[in-house]
């Protein structure tokens, strides 16, 4: 057990590290982050920044000299870095979990071994394998890079045979994953925490709405049947247990029109769709992550109020903060990024309301207000 007063190390210094660091410091921990940018978003709230590339084991080795436990804020990290750090300090979630989740082929193979439903898919390890995969999966389909995919990057939808060659060229070739494009009713996600003792705690189910392939809104509770919500949370727990997770896991799913669920992607870290927990749950996902990786008992995951999270993007700048906060139920969280660019996540708002529908409506209004569109 890592107790307050000791140091938590975080590989990566973006907004997830920033909010994890804030939660850790509130609990009395010291925090050291590792990032290539000495002025990364987490820097102002960390005790120290180890400056180095996230694919350079030597540059990040000093993190193990000061941290009692090490975690990471995203999955596209060179596993060699964490393997080196794990020689000296516990790394949670474990390197094997990261290795599985950062490669879509390994991820889908792991899900199938656990009996978790996924969309029909085929690995494409060479250009020669692509025609057979396309024939097996059929159209429409989506072609994805096996690695380095996030926020809609590394994906191409194929609706006609003519689009197939362009898709494989656009993604710079194998290794790739070809999936059937399923006609889903909505997209859901569950953030689940699991402790070293095996205790698992799934947060309430979020219903997610994307714009430009980037998460825009997370509505909680999700507007689906209670049975679907229970099934989603059960799937998340089964995956966490099957992976031997210690820490946090974001599980993205498709909900089909008949209520069946297909798991789409995994992220072994705090998740954008879990930001609502900061203001609407008994324990935030960030505090829960720190509890789990430090070996502490997990916190309660009760939903205290219906809520809608809305991302604040670079194209919303300059911000009209006063207009957005005119609704007293809007909670603003900005990440301290120096440059606002289109489609870059700059912050988020959590909007509380008596019902999920009202929270969604207020979130849309807050989004328009902060961007100066009303």
Regions found by a protein language model. Give the residues of each.
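Active-site "cap" helix and flanking loop/linker of ATP-utilizing ligase/carboxylase catalytic domains
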Residues: 230-251, 257, 267-315
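Short, low-complexity Ser/Thr-rich regulatory SLiMs
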Residues: 192-196, 253-257, 336
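Protein kinase-like catalytic core scaffold
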Residues: 201, 249, 261-265
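ATP-binding N-terminal substructure of ATP-dependent carboxylate-amine bond-forming enzymes
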Residues: 1-109, 113, 128
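Peripheral (often C-terminal) accessory segments that flank ATP-dependent C-N-forming ligase machineries
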Residues: 291-374
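Active-site nucleotide/adenylate-binding loops and adjacent lid/helix of ATP-dependent enzymes
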Residues: 100-189, 193-212, 216-242, 363, ...
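Short, flexible active-site loops
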Residues: 213-223, 265-278
């Amino acid at each position: 057990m890592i107790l307050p007063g000791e140091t938590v190390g975080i590989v990566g210094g973006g907004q997830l590290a920033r909010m994890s660091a804030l939660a850790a410091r509130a609990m009395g921990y010291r925090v050291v982050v590792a990032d290539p940018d000495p002025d990364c978003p987490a820097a102002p709230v960390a005790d120290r920044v180890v400056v180095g590339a996230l694919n350079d084991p030597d540059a990040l080795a000093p993190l193990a000299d000061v941290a009692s436990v090490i975690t990471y804020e995203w999955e596209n990290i060179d596993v060699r870095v964490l393997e080196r750090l794990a020689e000296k300090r516990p790394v949670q979630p474990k390197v094997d979990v990261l290795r599985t989740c950062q490669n879509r082929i390994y991820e889908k193979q792991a899900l199938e071994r656990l009996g978790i439903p996924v969309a029909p898919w085929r690995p494409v390890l060479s250009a020669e394998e692509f025609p057979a995969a396309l024939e097996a999966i059929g159209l429409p389909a989506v072609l994805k890079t096996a690695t380095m995919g996030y926020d809609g990057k590394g994906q191409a939808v194929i609706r006609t045979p003519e689009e197939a060659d362009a898709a494989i060229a656009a993604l710079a070739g194998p290794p790739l994953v070809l999936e059937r494009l399923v006609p889903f009713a909505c997209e859901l996600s569950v953030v689940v925490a699991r402790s070293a003792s095996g205790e698992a705690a799934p947060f309430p189910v979020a219903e997610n709405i994307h714009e430009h392939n980037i998460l825009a809104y997370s509505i909680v509770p999700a507007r689906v049947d209670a049975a679907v919500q229970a099934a989603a949370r059960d799937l998340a727990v089964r995956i966490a247990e099957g992976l031997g997770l210690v820490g946090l896991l974001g599980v993205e799913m498709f909900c089909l029109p008949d209520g069946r669920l297909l798991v789409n992607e995994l992220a072994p870290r705090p998740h954008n769709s879990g930001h609502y927990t900061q203001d609407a749950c008994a324990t935030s996902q960030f505090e829960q992550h720190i509890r789990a990786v430090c070996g502490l008992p997990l916190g309660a995951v009760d939903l205290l109020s219906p809520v809608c999270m809305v991302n604040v993007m670079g194209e919303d700048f300059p911000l009209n903060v006063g207009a957005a906060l005119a609704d007293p139920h809007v909670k603003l969280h900005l990440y301290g990024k120096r440059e606002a660019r289109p489609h870059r996540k700059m912050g988020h708002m959590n909007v509380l309301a008596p019902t999920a529908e009202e929270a969604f409506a207020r979130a849309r209004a807050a989004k328009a207000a902060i961007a100066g569109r009303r």
